[in-house]
Amino acid sequence: MRKITVLSMITLDGVMQAPGGPEEDLSGGFEYGGWSAPFNDEESGKVMQKLMQPSDLLLGRRTFKIWEDYWPKHTNYWPSINTVTKYVLSTTTTKSDWENTVFVNGIEAIRQIKNSDGSDLQVWGSSEVIQLLLKNDLIDELWLFIHPLTLGKGKKLFVGGAIPASFTLKESVVTPKGLIMANFSRAGDVKTGTSGG
């Protein structure tokens, strides 16, 4: 069985929309595209390089379209990006010239991929895919890149529908610019109790 890891850049108020650039995702009138750029530094770059090791990818259609134009020309930064399998959840797009791309449709297809043999899966961006995974308890790990700002609007990582779940902090890094990079692993059901005394 493959592990599914979600990697998401988020703000303090949970916004994950268009961290990479002004034109990345303008849906809903979003005007803060590129909000993560001021927080990039050497420390965050080291963590990102570690995470860009060969691993198959599970992407939504919008993220895939952005990546399809960009990453094949930037393999110096992510050498394995062309050779790993890119599973794309889409009901409208069904073909691509980008090598090793497989289009899938629906949660059952994702379950089959997760239960098959192969490398672990990473989910970058892809807010709709993440919501589907959260609702169906298919996320094994979260890598959250928590940026010290609020935006007030935009697509959020947790919008409702996630099942109650516990996570354990496995690793964390805080950069000089205040970016918190935290790796959480699924740890069973939510436990409750009484605080204090």
Language model regions located:
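Short, conserved catalytic or interaction motifs in soluble domains
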Residues: 141
